[in-house]
């Protein structure tokens, strides 16, 4: 948390990440944000969404819609003016630079739930690099934003945040913990499901989160805040 002379509002969960099937009357949470942070996160979220969208299942109408919007955003022919055409061209070039080809499916490093959707052996497999730093920063943003929304608490620089991208291995005890004690928010359709657990004593507050986006991108986060 820092002090700024002026602030804006930022959507905790990005507007462009909501599925078309999301209920129309849901509250799309916003929190105070400085303009600089808002701009930084907007670029980060756009880059993440652009990369993730190419890995979605086009047989699912919701996922297909996200992918179609992203492909349109990097297609120069849809540019409204010269500046827009140039921007789309740069985005497309940057995206293509992050695509690699493999003869066999890599045995490690694949984001859970974003691997091949068919067991058919292909001549080659296209992969796209997802920045682990961007994923972690995005997880931190959700954690900070929802901590403010649900608990009216601000995360300071001295507080600890950890974001954990799991691979469904050795986390049974964590799953059991959430099954027993978590408060669950699932009124946003499949856009995002949020589960949270809060504990505190005389010296610190501990909050655990589980985020499930599109029933695909799943991760946990942990906040340790000193009183």
What do the PLM-derived regions correspond to, one by one?
Residues 1-30, 46-47:
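Histidine-centered nuclease catalytic patch
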Residues 26-36, 63-78:
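Short Fe-S-cluster ligation motifs
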Residues 48-68, 94-97:
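Extended, surface-exposed interaction regions
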Residues 71-114:
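Short flanking/linker segments adjacent to small metal-binding domains or redox-active Cys/His motifs
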Residues 30-51:
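Short Cys/His-centered divalent metal-binding micro-motifs
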Residues 47-48, 65, 69, 134-137, ...:
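Exposed alpha-helical structural elements
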Residues 17, 38-42, 147:
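Hydrophobic/aromatic-lined pockets within catalytic cores
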Residues 103-227:
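C-terminal, charged low-complexity interaction regions
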